[in-house]
Amino acid sequence: MLVVLLTAALLVLSSAQGVDEEVVYEDSSQQLELEQQSQGHGQHHPKPPPGGLPPRPPASDENGDGDDNDDGDDDGSGDDVNRPERPPQHGGNHHHPHHPPPAAGPQRPPQPGSPQGPPPPGGPQQRPPQGPPPQGGPQRPPQPGSPQGPPPPGGPQQRPPQGPPPQGGPQRPPQPGSPQGPPPPGGPQQRAPQGPPPQGGPQRPPQPGSPQGPPPPGGPQQRPPQGPPPQGGPQRPPQPGSPQGPPPPGGPQQRPPQGPPPQGGPQRPPQPGNPQGPPQQGGQQQSSFLWSFSA
């Protein structure tokens, strides 16, 4: 690349120098044409007799500006070469145009040459573009390749999405499963409610049972009465007493009323119950009652 740029710079400089030289050639050629035209007009008649003597060209050179000779010997030599043509063709003015064309001809080649010179720099510029295009070309394959390259990563990305879908699929089963999972806890909750109901059930029995709890202290008083009836022979009361056995849960309240009546008038049942055997507990109470009455 550096070499190409250097060559391009040299070509540009050379083309610039060529343009300058062409400008100088154009100036000198124009001056020569003017001089030749002036000489042609002033020496048309003298030229034919001498037959194109060489001294006349020197005279023309002397009359001409020395700068023209200084500007370029090539121009002077060209004048010498073209000057023999002047005498035979009294229309040397036309030859001088022909002579400038040679001088202009070099200019024209340099001009196309200068374009050629710049084109090389332009060519290098095109070459760098060509260089990048190769790079761009690689980029294009890489671009399709890079899509291919990324697609593998992109494919993994799609695969991860596929991975998540399995995960999402598990999630879906878990979602129904999670409801199922919660239902088990919910089932335990229901079971727990079922557990509390047993507990609540116990509470309900305890609620009626709590009367049973109090009745037992009052019930022992009743039980001694029950005890006496079996001993007293009234097996019939035990038959209704068996209902009374079940009623304890349902009818302990009746027993408490029965308990208070014994308490209200316990002495009468205890009196028959005293001789019967459970007077131990009931007897103590009756003794307490007797003491109270005696007091």
Curated annotation (Swiss-Prot):
Compartments it resides in: Secreted
Region called Disordered, residue ranges: 16-295
Comp. bias intervals (Pro residues): 48-58, 100-187, 194-278
Keywords: Repeat, Secreted, Signal
Keyword Translocase assigned: no
A GO CC annotation given for this chain: extracellular region
InterPro entries in alphabetical order: Pro-rich
PTM annotation: Contains glycosaminoglycans of chondroitin-sulfate and heparan types.
Biased composition (Acidic residues): 62-78
Compositionally biased region (Low complexity): 26-41
Signal peptide residue numbers: 1-16
Name under which the protein is recorded: Proline-rich proteoglycan 2
Organism this protein belongs to: Rattus norvegicus
The organism's taxonomic lineage, starting at the top: Eukaryota, Metazoa, Chordata, Craniata, Vertebrata
This protein's encoding gene: Prpg2
